Design a protein with these regions (language model features):
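Left-handed beta-helix
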Residues: 2-22, 227-358
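Short coil/turn connectors at secondary-structure junctions
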Residues: 21-24, 75-76, 98-99, 126-129, ...
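Solvent-exposed alpha-helices and their adjacent loops that cap or buttress functional pockets
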Residues: 16-20, 45, 71-73, 124-126, ...
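A conserved hydrophobic position in a structured secondary element of the catalytic/binding core
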Residues: 82, 134, 205, 227, ...
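Conserved core of the sugar-phosphate nucleotidyltransferase
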Residues: 142-266, 287-288
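Conserved N-terminal catalytic core of the sugar/cofactor nucleotidyltransferase
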Residues: 2-30, 35-49, 54-147, 151
Length: 358
């Protein structure tokens, strides 16, 4: 059903594989961001998801993500997975993006359908695609180290097209709200210790387990993934065959666009599903993990973690310190803004499950 090495043409848009090769990116921007709504309401006055909120340096988190990955992937080869009800928040920012690059879900049903739709859409355009998936609303303090790992992972995926690479961040504390990756001991000949097997996933472990994982050198799961489009699709077909065939049936053989009416029915009748839990956890034999080191990564999933990233970024948002404490349910015992030469740091008590930022 794919057309390798061809041009995909639509009104006012031509995707040329000769310019950017077969490297693609997918930004997952369809989430609702409910955990951070107290903060986004404070910043924007509405319930927009955090990826569409200018929380760092006056730019939205989506804009930061686009700027970051443009260092590794041609912007013409970046797809956006969105959700229809969020259109008022992304329409203006993405109005110059061709329709081929925007996948608009009827509503948010989790990461698995969002990823599957984008993979089928991309495979129909370029069967030889190597694709990297990026959350739209995360933070990386050391972007150079992050991008370097992305580049090396693309190189690895090109040589080992049956593998899928996960990017792990060096853990800085026993975080109980993150997913963890326990590396295995298997390496591929010629690649040293940079890309190793995955023994197990640990999703939001209790504190004692998180302390053990930290001591053992396990990594935080950034949910950045790189591999061939064929490898990703095979993983989903093996672990979620019903969903795979259901989505495949909605993709015409002669066009790139999905049947919107079919997709509406599919989304209305399907249950929410999680890619990490339902696909990755059941496919560890195919996975490799690459550490990008202590890059200051945060998922910005809660106000406390956002404030830590704000401090690390050196951004001065005047509404942040006092209002977030009051309106997001944080006490002054949980968060203390330091002054003097350390004013760019924020310190959390252990009860808040965070230590001071680097």
């Amino acid at each position: 059903m794919g057309y390798p090495d061809r041009q995909v043409t639509e009104t006012r848009n031509t995707v040329s594989f000769s310019a950017a090769g077969h490297r693609w990116g997918v930004i997952l921007a369809g989430g609702d961001g409910t955990r951070l709504q107290p903060l986004t309401r404070l910043a924007c006055g509405d319930n927009r998801p955090k990826q569409f909120c200018p929380l760092l340096g006056g730019k939205t988190l989506l804009a930061h993500t686009r700027q970051r990955i443009a260092k590794a992937i041609d912007p013409d080869h970046v797809l956006f997975v969105l959700t229809k009800k969020h259109e008022p928040f992304y329409k203006r920012a993405l109005e110059s993006i061709p329709g081929f690059q925007k996948i608009v879900q009827p509503h948010n049903q989790g990461t698995l359908p969002a990823i599957l739709w984008s993979l089928l859409h991309l495979f129909h355009a370029d069967e030889r695609a190597l694709v990297a998936f990026f959350p739209s609303d995360h933070y990386f303090g050391d972007e150079a180290a992050f991008i370097s790992t992305i580049e090396r992972s693309f190189d690895f995926a090109e040589k080992e097209p049956d593998s899928v690479i996960l990017l792990g961040a060096g853990a800085e504390r026993p975080e109980t709200e993150y997913g963890w990756i326990e590396p295995g001991s298997v390496t591929l000949s010629g690649f040293g210790r940079e890309f190793v097997s995955v023994r197990r996933f640990w999703e939001k472990p209790p504190l004692e387990t998180a302390r053990l994982l930290l001591a053992q050198g396990c990594l935080w799961n950034t949910f950045v993934m790189i591999g061939s489009v064929a490898a990703f699709l095979e993983m989903i077909r093996n672990t979620a065959p019903v969903l795979f065939e259901t989505f495949k049936s909605a993709l015409p053989h002669s066009e790139v666009e999905f049947d919107e009416r079919k997709m509406q029915v599919i989304y209305d009748t399907m249950a929410s599903s999680d890619f990490s839990r339902e696909v990755l956890a059941a496919s560890t034999e195919r996975l490799r993990v690459a550490s990008c080191g202590e890059v200051g990564w945060s998922d910005l999933g809660e106000p406390r973690r956002f404030i830590a990233a704000l401090a690390q970024n050196g951004t001065d948002n005047p509404w942040a310190a006092t209002d977030i404490c009051n309106k997001c349910g944080l006490t002054h015992e949980q968060i203390v803004t330091l002054s003097g030469p350390e004013k760019n740091k924020i310190q959390f008590h252990e009860s808040a499950m965070l230590s001071s930022s680097r």
